[in-house]
Amino acid sequence: MASGDLYEVERIVDKRKNKKGKWEYLIRWKGYGSTEDTWEPEHHLLHCEEFIDEFNGLHMSKDKRIKSGKQSSTSKLLRDSRGPSVEKLSHRPSDPGKSKGTSHKRKRINPPLAKPKKGYSGKPSSGGDRATKTVSYRTTPSGLQIMPLKKSQNGMENGDAGSEKDERHFGNGSHQPGLDLNDHVGEQDMGECDVNHATLAENGLGSALTNGGLNLHSPVKRKLEAEKDYVFDKRLRYSVRQNESNCRFRDIVVRKEEGFTHILLSSQTSDNNALTPEIMKEVRRALCNAATDDSKLLLLSAVGSVFCSGLDYSYLIGRLSSDRRKESTRIAEAIRDFVKAFIQFKKPIVVAINGPALGLGASILPLCDIVWASEKAWFQTPYATIRLTPAGCSSYTFPQILGVALANEMLFCGRKLTAQEACSRGLVSQVFWPTTFSQEVMLRVKEMASCSAVVLEESKCLVRSFLKSVLEDVNEKECLMLKQLWSSSKGLDSLFSYLQDKIYEV
């Protein structure tokens, strides 16, 4: 049985911008040292906004302290250089007591040097920012100084255990027996020194990471409460990075739920969940693990607004340009093994299509057993348009399901099908409204998971057994044709010219 450990985020160590100008954060995983830190793109931290806000807030506070310190030093030097002239300007007697009072009065009218109260009460002001953190103050000869955040006994900053609140974010299949996730999470106690929070980001079907709470009066908090069940991955308050057979997946997320395995396409190395041989290998490995564990079925979905954009064209150009014969064989075999894994998987496969599915991402859908789609989803297989032959057994399954006329229009002309059209033609089982899509899917998946594993597996065998050998033969022929196409200079030049034109258009 494959293990299903969840890796919890301890804190954010650093951030940077990648080559595309997007933010990446250096994550410290709880229970791991600094050598295990990994850079994660911002779209993988969909529900870890409070970690991001805390990190950004501390940096903003640090910058403010530096600026305040510089201004304090400058103002002090100016006062020292003026000397008695300060007292003369005040038009007050020059006795020591009055002089001291005058100095403090000038200090109050200087905005950067607002006088703090000793023993600050910690209550937020009525006109302050809505989300705040606990910070202590003291007055030093050089001016205002901010004391470090207090550490609680569990090592977290102002940490309070928020088990009741966290439990609301778990689905029924998320809390495994013997695995108390709440032992590793602490709610942040927000609310004394005003520190602005950055706007929280939202991104389709994705993984959920967070550790902390927001002020109840914050509009961000109200938005999270309203949308906490909108997306599969916004139910958990943890990282969904999972250990399967002692290895971590880089471009997919695998979550072991109660009665089923959930695989999410979440590519770090390609845009719009495009497929490369490495990503397809990870999916195959996850399918192999799910086939041998106690899961009754498999749920396949994706992170982001696009389900899958098919093969990664930029990857094809780079690899086929370097070594045409070797790479054409390797990529064609990767596609063959990827499709074969779906054909041979014995348990029911449920697919949740949250957005566009193109090319190979749409071709594999007939190999799955149930396809549920959002109203926003659409389907396209423009193989002839991009100078490729069909893949994913679509040359056989599409005419069988859609009819020869519509299948030819999709494969030869790249016709786009809406979710409703795909449902009426039999490619999609059912279409749901986007705002309730995740709830509808999870409800039905959990109902299926309550059935007998033997009944589900044997039922699929009865439906699919006579097609298995046919699909395997079709898969072999399609991949052989792709290999021949990529190996020939004519076919490769045609592909390059089209893909380069598309890249230049972007």
From Swiss-Prot:
A Gene Ontology cellular-component term: nucleus
GO-annotated molecular function: histone H3K27me3 reader activity; histone H3K9me2/3 reader activity; methylated histone binding; transcription corepressor activity
A Pfam cross-reference name: ECH_1
Protein's UniProt name: Chromodomain Y-like protein 2
Protein keywords: Nucleus
Record's subcellular location: Nucleus
Domain Chromo residue range list: 7-67
Compositionally biased spans, kind Basic and acidic residues: 88-98
